[in-house]
């Protein structure tokens, strides 16, 4: 029996507590095992084949000769030299079914979190012996606490053109990259030595573990500017990243501004899927029934609120998956 991290041997015919002699704890630290990777990879390949055959939604595997597919790919397992190669083979094998929601999810890829490099939310120029120039500090999105560059924190305020000279007193250059200097710094305070023009100063920052939210909002802002420029300000833009709570929140974060225009470009490219597409369709299908006018309004407001004032176009690509594919 396993409970959390403890493995025990207990009777199956009656209940025992932890102090009962019949409750025997197994010390896993004393176990030793020898793994032959190639044997393990063969087992993983064969098990994947059995699982797909057992759980596939159609007994005839949608017309695919599954056993022939396995025979075709199985010899490749004897030619690989890493588990990453095996994952590639499994992806190719499952891909022969041409079926959505058929994934290969590798295990144990998180690594040691204490060694994770910190990120500063900026783009950099070519490093020199004088340091690493900041080409651009990513603006971020003030309404999302996860989408804010550490370099824009209070008391830091680094700008485009500043040069990071050192991290925790360790000088950057050809012998020490910024990435190396920030290794293991995610979520903890580090000191940057920065040159702004002719002035040197030291600032304390807390690097991020993940820039994805920051980069996402920056990308959305760039697409919004593109649509505004190309349409002469007539079209609004919004992006829905997935069909779960995050995407639902993003829709409402962006819809107020988007629906102030004559039409809307609704972007679901790279949508991760989920289950809220029907809600999204209902929300974007809201029709104008009336108008609210106010003395200080720069434009009349729709009734119901945030209804699309004109045509709506949906943009998608091959990376919109599941519910994100259905909606488009």
Set out the residue ranges of the language-model regions.
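Sequence signature of WD/YWTD-type beta-propeller architectures
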Residues: 1-103, 246
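A generic structural motif
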Residues: 10, 125, 193-197
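Solvent-exposed, polar/charged alpha-helical surfaces in well-ordered, non-transmembrane soluble domains
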Residues: 26, 42-46, 50, 67, ...
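Cleft-lining beta-strand/loop regions that shape enzyme active-site pockets
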Residues: 38, 53-55, 61, 144-150, ...
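PDZ/PDZ-like groove recognition
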Residues: 49-72, 123-143, 234
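Extended, small/polar residue-biased N-terminal targeting/export presequences
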Residues: 78-133, 200-203, 208-223
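PDZ/PDZ-like domain segments forming the peptide/carboxylate-binding groove
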Residues: 115-174, 244-245
């Amino acid at each position: 029996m396993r409970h959390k991290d403890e493995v025990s041997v207990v009777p199956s015919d009656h209940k025992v507590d932890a102090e009962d002699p019949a409750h025997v704890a197994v010390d896993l630290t004393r176990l030793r095992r020898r793994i032959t990777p190639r044997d393990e990879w063969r087992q993983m390949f064969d098990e994947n084949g059995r699982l797909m055959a057992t759980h596939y939604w159609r007994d005839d595997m949608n017309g695919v000769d599954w056993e022939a597919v396995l025979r075709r790919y199985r010899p490749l397992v004897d030619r690989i030299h890493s588990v990453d190669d095996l994952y590639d083979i499994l992806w190719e094998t499952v891909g022969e079914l041409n079926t959505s929601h058929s994934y290969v999810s590798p295990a144990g890829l998180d690594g040691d979190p204490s060694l994770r490099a910190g990120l500063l939310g900026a783009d950099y120029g070519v490093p020199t012996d004088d340091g690493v120039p900041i080409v651009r500090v990513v603006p971020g999105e003030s309404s999302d606490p996860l989408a804010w560059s550490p370099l824009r924190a209070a008391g830091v305020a680094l700008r485009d053109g500043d040069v990071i000279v050192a991290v925790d007193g360790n000088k950057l250059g050809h012998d020490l990259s910024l990435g190396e200097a920030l290794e293991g710094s995610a979520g903890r305070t580090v000191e940057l030595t920065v040159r702004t023009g002719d002035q040197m100063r030291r600032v304390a920052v807390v690097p991020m573990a993940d820039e994805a939210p920051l980069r996402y909002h920056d990308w959305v802002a760039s697409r919004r500017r593109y649509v505004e420029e190309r349409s002469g300000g007539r079209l609004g833009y919004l992006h829905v990243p997935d069909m779960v709570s995050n995407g639902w929140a993003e829709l409402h974060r962006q819809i107020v501004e988007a629906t102030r225009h004559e039409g809307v470009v609704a972007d679901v490219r790279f949508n991760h899927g989920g289950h809220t597409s029907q809600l999204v369709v209902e929300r974007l299908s809201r029709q104008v029934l009336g108008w609210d006018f106010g003395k200080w309004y720069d434009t009349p407001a729709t009734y119901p609120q945030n209804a699309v004032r004109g045509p709506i176009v949906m943009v998608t690509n091959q990376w919109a998956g599941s519910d994100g594919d259905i909606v488009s």
